[in-house]
Amino acid sequence: MLFSHPPIRLAWSSAFRSARQLPLSRPRFFSISVPRYAVDMETVDTTERLSRLRQLMKDHQVDVYIVPSEDSHQSEYIAPCDGRREFISGFSGSAGTAIVSLTKAALSTDGRYFNQASKQLDSNWVLLKRGVEGVQTWQEWTTEQAEGGKVVGVDPALITASGARSLSETLQKNGSSLKGIRPNLVDLVWGNDRPSPPREKVTVHPEKFAGKSFQDKISELRKELEKKKTAGFVISMLDEIAWLFNLRGTDIPYNPVFFSYAIITPTTAELYVDDDKLTPEVKAHLGQDVVVKPYDSIYADAEALSAARKQDAGDAAPKFLLSNKASWALSLSLGGEEQTEEVRSPIADAKAVKNDVELSGMRACHIRDGAALIEYFAWLENELVNKKTTLDEVDAADKLEQIRSKHELFAGLSFDTISSTGPNGAVIHYKPEKGSCSIIDPNAIYLCDSGAQFLDGTTDVTRTFHFGKPTELEKKAFTLVLKGMIALDSAVFPKGTSGFALDVLARQYLWQEGLDYLHGTGHGIGSYLNVHEGPMGIGTRVQYTEVPIAPGNVISNEPGFYEDGKFGIRIENVIMAREVQTPHKFGDRPWLGFEHVTMAPIGLNLIEPSLLSDSEIKWVNDYHAEVWEKTHHFFQNDERTRSWLQRETQPISK
């Protein structure tokens, strides 16, 4: 599962005798016969919705209105009740910003969703392709629409304080202004059709899985706050709260979190969550250490804290710490910049470094998850090739979930399974829908990006298979991606190295061909938490220069290759950073490397061994031997799957 950037339209020659003879520069477009696939996605008529929104904008004296994707906690994944951008635009991808003026509307998203957005947006909308040269950012488009002293409105709960300041400064240069608008105007348009907020129960995440008590975590956080000489920390990120208190929920699909806020001071711990969501077990778990308050009272309490701080010591009083991802609304309630200090959350940093119990859980859950994947791919090949069964992408995804659910400690999926055949694989965050998805073609590449939540860890894995005979082009592309994945997996680097610096390792072999993939190479992964976790990552994002890879980080390694309209390739393992022994220690500092924990075969018939070095062939063979060793015992009574696993983990050679 991955971040950012667009799929690439590639140019390859079909006139070659072997993989090594593929042209290295200025290749020509090739032509292959591609069966017809159902890739259309439903387009929503937004005319009436936009008309009603524009009337509300006039009522609130707003000329341009911004509709972000995020909720009040700046969550990447959101509950259905917070799907405002999707409701107003019709675009269902997980990332994007909608901007509506009194006469125009635009949707900005990144390259994972260009294909999807172009299909889902109706004629009312302009698609702003983020990161494409010559295309305006949503901020630039907004500023242009607001020229002449116009007012731009946004729900202050849905934009970060830093984002609001930056946009406001840009607008002011243009003679325009930014205005916080409550209630949310899209909610008013949505009306009674808007889904109700979730009311599911919160559960305790036992220490045998968490590895540390919540009291110890709060104690360590207080030590950090003491170093910063702050009055306290106001927490709004849902995964940080779940991690800190060793609690989990189901308020957001695939993310075991619950709607809440928290305030930690040197002497108090307050958790803002509605009481009816807390079971007796949760209340006993929190005990006398935590004061529970209603979820909606956070803003009033923040204002009271701000007022009390001013009254007690004025401007000389310690400031409250606030995450740089916290909302503008929360910042304003605490008194804004004068009374808050925005920083990268110390909880995010602590959460990203898994303890020994969490790391052991990650290893264990990935073995079980690997067994599920092996059973699934063996089943899928048998159905498609031997039984000639007609299966669509959703049928296959449902089967994978069914197989996963049989395994110990399974708690659900970690994201929507990307089950994609042929050209659908080039839609990087493709989401198959029953009734419109494609029938899986055994003679085309099949890309499956999936993951699960287990009580002892979170998984995320992508495998690309071909159940027929792949072309030389497909094998070449797959092998280049594999080489990059191996290079990152095998990396040794000094402590303090960032994911930004490591990113080139995964891209180098594609770059040598003048090719690239325009998404991140790796993201952090939570421990029975969000499948996308910061603050570190591997990619070209500027923020990845700020956070070095540290021992205990759990990260995805997922280079890819996408030929728009034809196929997609991605190979993804989860890797854990750890200290390694080296012959020398230049600068007398620790050196780090990675341990892979994903245990699933890499499609052998897509590998072109002649493109691999001896060390890369050894890596493939060692990896497959490890997969066999750790998973074959699951199939003692399943000869079909065991035989498939044995075949798919046999050694390769040039």
From Swiss-Prot:
Please give the coiled-coil regions recorded for this protein: none
Enzyme Commission code: 3.4.11.9
Q: Which residues bind Mn(2+) 1?
A: 460, 558, 572
Residues engaged in binding Mn(2+) 2 = 449, 460, 572
**Could you state a single Gene Ontology molecular function term?**
metal ion binding
Q: Identify the CDD domains for this entry.
A: APP
Instruction: Write down the InterPro entries for this protein, in alphabetical order.
Output: Creatin/AminoP/Spt16_N, Creatinase/aminopeptidase-like, Creatinase_N, Pept_M24, Pept_M24B, Peptidase_M24_C, Peptidase_M24B_aminopep-P_CS, X-Pro_aminopeptidase_P
Entry keyword set: Aminopeptidase, Hydrolase, Manganese, Metal-binding, Metalloprotease, Protease
Gene Ontology CC annotation, any one: cytoplasm
Query: Its catalytic activity?
Result: Release of any N-terminal amino acid, including proline, that is linked to proline, even from a dipeptide or tripeptide
Q: Which cofactor does it need?
A: Mn(2+)
Tell me the GO BP annotations in alphabetical order.
proteolysis
UniProt cofactor note: Binds 2 manganese ions per subunit.
Q: Which family does it belong to?
A: Belongs to the peptidase M24B family.
PANTHER family, A to Z: XAA-PRO AMINOPEPTIDASE 1
What this protein is reported to do is described as: Catalyzes the removal of a penultimate prolyl residue from the N-termini of peptides.
Q: What is this protein called?
A: Probable Xaa-Pro aminopeptidase P
Query: Which organism encodes this protein?
Result: Aspergillus terreus (strain NIH 2624 / FGSC A1156)
UniProt lists the gene as ampp
